[in-house]
């Protein structure tokens, strides 16, 4: 079995009355304050999809580079973020299955201005020693989208959709213009919920391009995910 992890929500910094900026993750309209170590772990997964081993390695590296006192264990912060719904995981027999179980129930949120996010990512890579200063230009450049990715961005910009809803609607060639269309076209049975939709979909080769396009948009920092 393979387990994949990612972070959900959007990072914002809010100033206190004393003028200090504190990190907040906004997920489905709720604000969550993060400790320094929680932010460190959450940022390891922002726009990344990692196995547990990869995540622990990334977190350990950033802890080594971090100044000041060390916190509690990696597992402690992973559990805290998971309980608060800011880190999610998906388990499957194959990479595709695990990826779908990871993303299926998450709502796709298109990002308008992605330059600050790309810059933040470059700074992280630079501090980790992954890239040099001369490589900033290449990493800051916005990657072109494929036709499939453009279609997904346009649809997600019009209607709030989960990955499972998007995969199902595109597979069945449903025309979605608004929220009502989602309910009418995809939730045709009284017992159908967004979670049963995730559970009922059996990923096969015709759906791979859609799932891959969604993952690429996320890794290229053009979308983020929120929980329902």
Feature annotation, model-predicted:
Residues 1-18, 88-89:
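N-terminal leader segment of winged-helix/HTH proteins
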Residues 12-13, 26-30, 137-139:
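Short, flexible segments with low predicted structural confidence
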Residues 20-25, 29, 34:
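A short, structured beta-strand/loop element
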Residues 6, 14-15, 24, 69-70, ...:
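Short amphipathic alpha-helical surface micro-motifs
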Residues 32-228:
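Long, charge-rich, low-complexity alpha-helical segments
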